[in-house]
Design a protein with these regions (language model features):
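Sequence-level detector for tyrosine residue identity
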Residues: 2, 6, 10, 56, ...
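Generic preference for flexible, low-structure residues
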Residues: 23, 50, 54, 89, ...
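Short amphipathic alpha-helical segments and their helix-coil junctions
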Residues: 29-68
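Amphipathic protein-protein interaction modules
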Residues: 66-132
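Domain-length accessory/inserted modules outside core catalytic folds
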Residues: 39-42, 46-49, 55, 115-135
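Context-gated lysine
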Residues: 5, 29, 40, 45, ...
């Protein structure tokens, strides 16, 4: 896995990471768009401003359990890493992201050029203004 060096250490190691993986697993499909992820977990309400998590972020799992996210920027950083993995290797195996609970199933996150630019801007803002974020 291309992102293996970072995943679980610097990225992918939070409660929000586990919630994101549960969400991706629950979608039961190989390909999911970034637009769909944003809509289903509530990130679209933040209008690409992830400094403060002012809106509820979460989803209703197919098993009936409400799963929430604490910090939008955690989810964005994790999604960015998964997007990078998908760019390099076309897919990512959920089991590689969580070897304890995730099934061995490939997924791919698809993003438009505009969405990728917006992700870049959000990550750049985070690196330049980390104390502005609610972590």
């Amino acid at each position: 896995m291309y992102i293996e060096k970072y995943w679980g250490e610097y990225i992918g190691g939070s409660d929000d990471s586990l919630s994101l993986l549960a969400f991706l697993e629950d979608q039961n499909k190989e390909e999911i768009t970034l637009t769909e992820i944003f809509a289903k977990i509530g990130l679209e309400k933040l209008d690409w401003n992830f400094r403060q998590t002012t809106e509820y972020l979460g989803f209703l799992h197919s098993n009936g359990v409400e799963t929430d996210f604490n910090f939008a920027i955690d989810v964005i950083v994790d999604i960015a890493a998964i997007l990078l993995e998908c760019k390099i290797n076309k897919v990512v195996n959920l089991h590689d992201l969580d070897e304890y609970d995730a099934p061995s199933r490939n997924i791919r996150i698809i993003a438009t050029t505009e969405e990728l630019r917006s992700m870049d801007k959000a990550l750049l803002d985070f690196t330049q203004n980390p104390l502005e974020y609610d972590l």
